[in-house]
UniProtKB/Swiss-Prot annotation:
Subunit and partners: F-type ATPases have 2 components, F(1) - the catalytic core - and F(0) - the membrane proton channel. F(1) has five subunits: alpha(3), beta(3), gamma(1), delta(1), epsilon(1). F(0) has three main subunits: a(1), b(2) and c(10-14). The alpha and beta chains form an alternating ring which encloses part of the gamma chain. F(1) is attached to F(0) by a central stalk formed by the gamma and epsilon chains, while a peripheral stalk is formed by the delta and b chains.
Keywords in alphabetical order: ATP synthesis, Cell inner membrane, Cell membrane, CF(0), Hydrogen ion transport, Ion transport, Membrane, Transmembrane, Transmembrane helix, Transport
Organism: Chromohalobacter salexigens (strain ATCC BAA-138 / DSM 3043 / CIP 106854 / NCIMB 13768 / 1H11)
One GO location term (cellular component): proton-transporting ATP synthase complex
Name the record gives this protein: ATP synthase subunit b
Classification via Pfam families: ATP-synt_B
GO MF term list: proton-transporting ATP synthase activity, rotational mechanism; proton-transporting ATPase activity, rotational mechanism
Keyword hit for Glycoprotein: no
InterPro entries for the chain: ATP_synth_B-like_membr_sf, ATP_synth_b/b'su_bac/chlpt, ATP_synth_F0_bsu_bac, ATP_synthase_B_chain
Bilayer disposition of the protein: Single-pass membrane protein
Length: 156
């Protein structure tokens, strides 16, 4: 085996090159790779956190939407109940007012009927007295006659 000085020189140059690379080139390259690896890992973690946060936000939004819909449904239901209650109250008030008006009208009719009966009795009594005076054409005691007519009128 012939070893040339060139081969030994190349081996020494290669060893110096390797040592130089290990000492000065390799650490910054490794540091850059580690920093890049850390950035990628941080980015993936951030993306994972963002995904979880997005899912959580979507769940919260869906829950709030559901609660809002339930509240809206409750408000609408309460409004319907209140409207129905107001309608029922108005119907009851109208019915009571109608009954009161009917009773008032009945009372007025009864009063008018009584007044008309009294007026009729008075007129009948006056006509009876006039008729009796003409028939008898005599003097009858006015007080007794009036008493008899009042009794007859009361019987009518």
């Amino acid at each position: 085996m012939n070893l040339n000085l060139t081969l030994i020189g190349q081996a020494i140059a290669f060893a110096v090159f390797v040592w130089f690379c290990m000492k000065f080139v390799w650490p910054p390259v490794m540091q850059a790779l580690q920093e890049r690896q850390k950035k990628i890992a941080d980015g993936l973690d951030a993306a994972s956190r963002a995904t979880r946060d997005l899912e959580l936000a979507q769940e919260q939004a869906a829950e709030q939407l559901k609660e809002s819909k339930e509240q809206a449904a409750q408000i609408i239901e309460q409004a319907h109940k209140r409207a129905n209650q107001m309608i029922e109250e108005a119907r009851d008030n109208a019915r009571l007012e109608g009954e009161r008006m009917i009773e008032s009208a009945r009372g007025e009719i009864e009063q008018e009927t009584q007044r008309a009966k009294e007026e009729l009795r008075t007129q009948v009594a006056a006509l009876a007295i006039q008729g009796a005076e003409r028939i008898l054409d005599s003097s009858i005691d006015e007080a007794k006659h009036r008493e008899l007519v009042d009794k007859l009128a009361a019987e009518l």
